[in-house]
UniProtKB/Swiss-Prot annotation:
MF annotations from Gene Ontology: 2,5-dichloro-2,5-cyclohexadiene-1,4-diol dehydrogenase activity
Active-site residues from the entry: 154 (proton acceptor)
InterPro entries cross-referenced by the UniProt entry: NAD(P)-bd_dom_sf, Sc_DH/Rdtase_CS, SDR_fam
SUPFAM superfamilies from the UniProt entry: NAD(P)-binding Rossmann-fold domains
One Pfam family matching this protein: adh_short_C2
Binding positions (substrate): 141
Listed name of the protein: 2,5-dichloro-2,5-cyclohexadiene-1,4-diol dehydrogenase
Chain's role: Catalyzes the dehydrogenation of 2,5-dichloro-2,5-cyclohexadiene-1,4-diol (2,5-DDOL) to 2,5-dichlorohydroquinone (2,5-DCHQ), a step in the degradation of gamma-hexachlorocyclohexane (gamma-HCH or lindane). Has an essential role in this assimilation pathway that allows S.japonicum UT26 to grow on gamma-HCH as the sole source of carbon and energy.
Induction / repression: Constitutively expressed.
Pathway: Xenobiotic degradation; gamma-hexachlorocyclohexane degradation
């Protein structure tokens, strides 16, 4: 387990799935965690289970004032900011590109791209102001590395996240700030579990498209994210860590 004792980390989308698993592992690794979500009940439940090492802040990452407030509240609560896991996103699938409405496309870009940009912007500014050599991890996707049919707006958004990650790594390496992307394949999140409950063929299909023969559990993504956030990855920046069971290898 990585040692993050005394470090302060923001986790967006921290109320469920990969975000929740990452909060739990960060707390177990000694970190203080600012849990951000738009689901107050879920976020507060994660904090209640943290043993006093986490605080919940409501944040819609597509809203600049919310993101600025999240960073300010984190600094006020914990006295610094050492890292961030920008994980909040909305997955969308099921339509060929020409059938995607402009409204749906913009929603994907607003949350998945603009939200990630805003989070990085204000996290980086806070780190530079305090001279902190921090680490930022953005959740991309296998869909941010390859084309996936029927996922047009999501593929476009996650490719943009990968690009923003690489640019930020190049821009801010001189400040000692590392920026990397986590690239999951399919993950057993609550949303995916609901979809599988309604479609008996979905789980066997997802297993079949990952060379490892199954898809990921949230804690496996959390382990990868926490490693990137830790000093164990001190020379890793601008990278896309594929924790995807081989999905992007074929």
């Amino acid at each position: 387990m990585s040692d993050l004792s005394g470090k302060t980390i923001i986790v967006t989308g921290g109320g469920s799935g990969i975000g929740r698993a990452t909060v739990e592992l960060l707390v177990a690794s000694g970190a203080n965690v600012a849990v951000a979500d738009i689901n107050d009940e879920a976020g507060e439940a994660v904090v209640a289970a943290s043993g006093g090492k986490a605080a919940y802040f409501r944040c819609d990452i597509a809203q600049e004032e919310d993101v600025k407030a999240l960073v300010a509240q984190t600094l006020a609560a914990f006295g610094g900011l050492d890292g961030a896991f920008n994980n909040a996103a909305i997955p969308q699938a099921g339509l060929p590109l020409a059938e995607v409405s402009l409204e749906r496309f913009r929603q994907s870009m607003d949350i998945n791209v603009t939200g990630t940009f805003l989070c990085m912007k204000y996290q980086i500014l806070a780190m530079i102001e305090r001279g902190t050599k921090g680490s930022i991890v953005n959740t991309a996707s296998a869909a941010g590395v390859v084309g996936v049919p029927m996922h047009g707006e999501y593929v476009g958004a996650k490719h943009a996240v990968v690009g923003l990650t690489r640019v930020a790594a190049a821009d801010y390496g001189k400040h000692g700030i590392r920026v990397n992307a986590l690239v999951p394949g399919a993950v057993r999140t609550p949303m995916l579990q609901r979809a599988m409950d309604n479609d008996a063929g979905l789980e066997p299909y997802l297993n079949s498209i990952h060379p490892i023969g199954r898809f990921s559990e949230p804690h496996e993504q959390a382990q990868a994210a926490v490693w990137l956030l830790s000093d164990a990855a001190s020379f890793v920046t601008g990278s896309c860590l594929a924790a995807d069971g081989g999905f992007t290898a074929i």
